[in-house]
Amino acid sequence: MGALLELQGVTAGYGGGDILHELDLGVEDGAITCIVGPNGAGKSTVLRVVSGLLRPRLGQVRFRGSSIGGLSPRAILHRGIVQVPQERSLFPTMTVWENVRMGAYTVHDRPLVDRRLQAVCETFPIVRERRLEPAASLSGGQQKIVEFARALMLDPALLVLDEPSMGLDPKTRTIVFDTIRAMNQAGRTILLVEQNARSGLGLASHGVVMESGRVRLEGLGSAVLNNPEIGHLYLGATA
């Protein structure tokens, strides 16, 4: 499989200060790519560039071989990149069913929406089981899974997850990561940023360690996880 997403020599930042410095990064089609690193490494900035919320000052961002670095977030969404934010984003007073259906707000083909909803229910049983309950009645981990379901209503080519385990207890984090693994096994390409390096790299087929806006180390997730060069810097603090 080839690269679905490529960042080539990307420099980007805010207010005249660069956070990313000539960054090269690739996401292979069909892979789980996990970015880890200390606070301030530029992980979230990468996701902002990929989703169109921040335009690079230098370099190229290519998706399926086409440049997307100058596109709006909406245009990038239409290209097939869908992001699930770190913050809880469900509408608390709306039902689970209503929240999930809203994921297809750009799809005007009602039969297609119904088919996707059926597929989502098969993948995420909680959507059917709790469909009439308000989103606020769900636990943090359950809400995160419903957010995944909502994102899949757009059938993204690339699913981008910003720290999906943030604020979750270890048991719930395991459930969420098992769900991410299942989505990937079903054919979904996933790019995630994860503060918990052990969990993220243990899940990933490709691991990337960032520091000061650059890629410091990358390779197979398991190899990066066990590399002594980064263990004392990242893993001890984020386990």
List the predicted regions and their residue ranges:
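ABC-type ATPase nucleotide-binding domains, specifically the catalytic core motifs of the NBD
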Residues: G15, T33, L71, V96-R115, ...
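Helix-to-loop junction immediately C-terminal to a conserved catalytic motif
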Residues: S51
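The feature captures the beta-strand-to-loop junction immediately N-terminal to the Walker
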Residues: V36-P38
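Conserved ABC transporter NBD signature motif
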Residues: G59-I68, R79, L112-L117, L217-G219
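ABC ATPase C-loop
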Residues: A151-L152
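Conserved ABC ATPase signature
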Residues: P134-L138
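Catalytic Walker B motif of ABC-type/P-loop ATPase nucleotide-binding domains
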Residues: L159-E163
